[in-house]
């Protein structure tokens, strides 16, 4: 949940910028692009892995990347399929849905479940809405059937982004997200407070020092400006009556949306 990786590699078919900013990827930043000419899997390492279109129940293997991509739609795989045993650990509704895609890099798992997040449809939208031309990570299932579930916002400024995670042990985590406009407003308030202090600086920087918006497109992909600010443990079945008083991790960003610093639960800067 808290891990992240950096890659300066720029693919020609990138996924959108993730919640840690340009170049950084979280495990849940995996994304599948569904195009007429094929499928493009953007992994958490920044790569774009291309596959041919899949029929329901079909599995394709990329030898160059040692990765399988599958499409749901069948209850079971043929016994000659190397992934037939691993297929059976998936929930039945996942196996049977032709709208769900799955990826794995090992015959022992885990499976990455690629589906679309729930959202609140528009007032004039025809129901049910058509599946989008992409899939995002909604869960991870290990070889024993234990599931890590990602909860995404259905509406609002951060619609579609991961705001909660439930692990196989039943622990629940809340991800606090901010928009560029919210960070800019917080910067201005902090600046105003420091200027009003006797010990504060005497000159204020212009409002352009922290813009309300970021450029929509970058070399790393489209950027909506949403960033991860903090991760909280909100429920632990082993300690149901205990509530943490500090986040597990906290993150700060520059005015241009780049990751500046990372703090652990003790408040110590670790990056």
Regions found by a protein language model. Name each.
Residues 1-271:
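Surface-exposed recognition patches
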